[in-house]
Amino acid sequence: MGTNTGKLWGGRFAGGPSPELDALSRSTHFDWRLTPYDLAGSRAHANALHRAGLLTDADLAELRRGLDALGERYAAGTLRPDPSDEDVHGALERLLVDEVGPEVGGRLRAGRSRNDQIATLFKVFLRDHAAVVAGQVLDLVDALAGQARAAGDAVMPGRTHLQHAQPVLLAHHLLAHCWALLRDVDRLRDWDARVAADSPYGSGALAGSSLGLDPEGVAAELGFSGSSANSIDGTASRDFVAEFAYVTAQIGVDVSRIAEEVILWSTREFGFVTLHDSWSTGSSIMPQKKNPDIAELARGKAGRLIGNLSGLLATLKALPLAYNRDLQEDKEPVFDSVDTLEVLLPAFTGLVATLAFDTERMADLAPQGFSLATDVAEWLVREGVPFRIAHEVAGACVRRCEELGIELADLTDEQFAEISPALTPGVREVLSVAGSVSARDGRGGTAPIRVREQLAELTGLVDGHRDRLG
């Protein structure tokens, strides 16, 4: 047992806390993972104390040695908190005092509080993991873009309300998911820029420090571009946690939309994709089954990520300034969100990268469900018919086909003319899937030339994101 109980308070109290309070307060079972960040903060704080004339050269050297020794033991897996330790901060101070003695080790706490300490190191932790998650999202974008590139000009039925709508390129559909995921990466970058400018170190418990410390210097040493403008805000705000939790939840939602499509497309009724054996599972009783477990888990974990966000927001609601112990509850939900995404995204990327698309079946289904009706209406517009009338005429064509049990292209010239004199034989030029997709050649459209441009644009953006991530 060390020379400190692992608690950073006590002089004002005649006795120790009850065992029940100890059990409730203890957080080392989840915040111990912050040890490397706490040690980095302590090194920066020791340097600030030295610059302020509060540590001798010898004291600074000994503190650095002790902190490095603890870091080596943590990396080796031999550094452990004691049951008496309240949190990671108290545990590490106790262990540091054991390492360098109370005369030197006891000097490190000057000028800092757990309040500014945890707010800062939590930001550094989340910034590191934001970069990891962003890289994994980009890997998923690469997998989707690779499938889009391989699909070429293959077509599929585009859907709204899950009903046949208009033919689109398979690549166009896959790239739609890429753009949503790239916005998630943009959100992580935006979040990081805000967090980087706001290091809480130096805020103390809430009012700042009287010891002449250098918050900007500590901020720079820890990778921040600036320090908190308001010490109360620096210690009490957790919007950076909530915003991070939102982005992780949005990533989960975006992945779940892809997952739902994979689940549907892999059914016999759709038959659009075949799952690779390595990325699917079987049944304990039904020998024929090939289950999309990764996609289903992605769909389920999206709910978990949303739950973490909503629980965190409920914790933060109506907290008065400044720090409150409620904020101990801010870490577990976000730790869980980080862990969830960092295990989910690589698995989901593997699933997507190995999907085998049945492009022949997709092409067969692309014109069905009267998906070329909009092309008929737009052809009429180009022939001078007002769209309101053109819409009615195209709808009448669909109704006639339903009565006859045929598709639009199966109507004869005479049947078209019976529906409307404006439907001359020239309408047949738009009654093909290839003609339909090629005609939609405005920016963002599904025409093959535009999709190729889109893919090139997206690839450049991904490369730019990777360069910034290093």
From Swiss-Prot:
Pathway: Amino-acid biosynthesis; L-arginine biosynthesis; L-arginine from L-ornithine and carbamoyl phosphate: step 3/3. Keywords: Amino-acid biosynthesis, Arginine biosynthesis, Cytoplasm, Lyase. Gene3D superfamilies: Fumarase/aspartase (C-terminal domain) (1.10.40.30), Fumarase/aspartase (Central domain) (1.20.200.10), Fumarase/aspartase (N-terminal domain) (1.10.275.10). It is found in: Cytoplasm. Signal peptide: none annotated. PROSITE patterns: FUMARATE_LYASES. It catalyses: 2-(N(omega)-L-arginino)succinate = fumarate + L-arginine. Pfam families: ASL_C2, Lyase_1. GO terms for biological process: arginine biosynthetic process via ornithine; L-arginine biosynthetic process. Its EC number is 4.3.2.1. InterPro entries: Arg_succ_lyase_C, Argininosuccinate_lyase, Fumarase/histidase_N, Fumarate_lyase_CS, Fumarate_lyase_fam, Fumarate_lyase_N, L-Aspartase-like. GO terms for cellular component: cytosol. It is an enzyme of class 4 (lyase). GO terms for molecular function: argininosuccinate lyase activity. Belongs to the lyase 1 family. Argininosuccinate lyase subfamily. This is Argininosuccinate lyase.
